[in-house]
From Swiss-Prot:
Catalyzes the reductive methylation of 2'-deoxyuridine-5'-monophosphate (dUMP) to 2'-deoxythymidine-5'-monophosphate (dTMP) while utilizing 5,10-methylenetetrahydrofolate (mTHF) as the methyl donor and reductant in the reaction, yielding dihydrofolate (DHF) as a by-product. This enzymatic reaction provides an intracellular de novo source of dTMP, an essential precursor for DNA biosynthesis. It comes from Edwardsiella ictaluri (strain 93-146). The lineage of its organism: Bacteria, Pseudomonadati, Pseudomonadota, Gammaproteobacteria, Enterobacterales. Pathway: Pyrimidine metabolism; dTTP biosynthesis. This is Thymidylate synthase. The keyword Cell inner membrane does not apply.
Length: 264
């Protein structure tokens, strides 16, 4: 994951000081891309320990179409708590948009089922896209989508995915986002009898928060270690039937975790 550390260095060297919604302040660059060949290992940051339980359960929560933190709490995941209301609701965030995008005529579109069908029937289509950026519902969301738009691509029997992330917290959020979409590519490839290809990450406002500078400096002193490998323990009936126990990460040997505050 050297390219992740290189991104940190770039933000530190070239970033513009900016105010932000949270009032914390950032160093920010605009427009950056990284490519991860998923054949070469699972892109889980090794220069600090990542909380894989949270990454997996959050993705399953998205795929279930849920927007209340109750499922996450049942599985000891608290990463969305800061934005939830007193009932645990977040409004029409990722799960709602992925699984039940509302149309003007009252229909709902299950975008995940739709792209799975497209990949089976029209793998060369240039329209195999999921969007969480529903302009008509942004004001109802506890947090507007950061990872907002992703596209799939099939070539030579391999499934690739590119994500556009309009806002990226490089220290805390980005390792989660990379691992989450890499997981999704592995799951979809298994369901479609394809090999995994590349995960391409594209960032818009790509930033380090001002209260993450010491943690970033510490992480940059550490040498990356070999990437782990993801093993899927079984093949469920559909993309929606995976369980936490289905994901086995082999050979993950990270440096110790580094704590940092979340900007809310």
């Amino acid at each position: 994951m050297k390219q992740y550390l290189d991104l940190m260095r770039k933000v530190l060297a070239e970033g513009t000081p900016k105010a932000d919604r949270t009032g914390t302040g950032t160093l920010s660059i605009f427009g950056h891309q990284m490519r991860f060949n998923l054949q070469q290992g699972f892109p889980l940051v090794t220069t600090k320990k990542c909380h894989l339980r949270s990454i997996i359960h959050e993705l399953l929560w998205f795929l279930n179409g849920e927007t209340n933190v109750s499922y996450l709490h049942e599985n000891n995941v608290t990463i969305w708590d800061e934005w939830a209301d007193d009932n645990g609701d977040l409004g029409p965030v990722y799960g709602k948009q992925w699984r039940a995008w509302g149309c003007a005529d009252g229909r709902q579109v299950d975008q995940i089922s739709q792209v799975m069908e497209q990949l089976r029937q029209e793998p060369d289509s240039r329209r195999i896209i999921v969007s969480a950026w529903n302009v008509g519902e942004l004001d109802q969301m506890a947090l507007a989508p950061c990872h907002a738009f992703f596209q799939f691509y099939v070539a030579d029997g391999r499934l690739s995915c590119q994500l556009y992330q309009r806002s990226c917290d490089v220290f805390l959020g980005l390792p989660f986002n990379i691992a989450s979409y890499a997981l999704l590519v592995h799951m979809m490839a298994q369901q479609l009898d394809l090999q995994v290809g590349d995960f391409v990450w594209t960032g818009g406002d790509t930033h380090l928060y001002s209260n993450h500078m010491e943690q970033t400096a510490l992480q940059l002193t550490r040498e990356p270690r070999a990437l782990p490998r993801l093993v899927l323990a079984r093949r469920p009936a559909s993309i929606f039937d995976y369980r936490f126990e289905d994901f086995i990460i082999e050979g993950y040997d990270p440096h110790p975790a580094i704590k940092a505050p979340v900007a809310v």
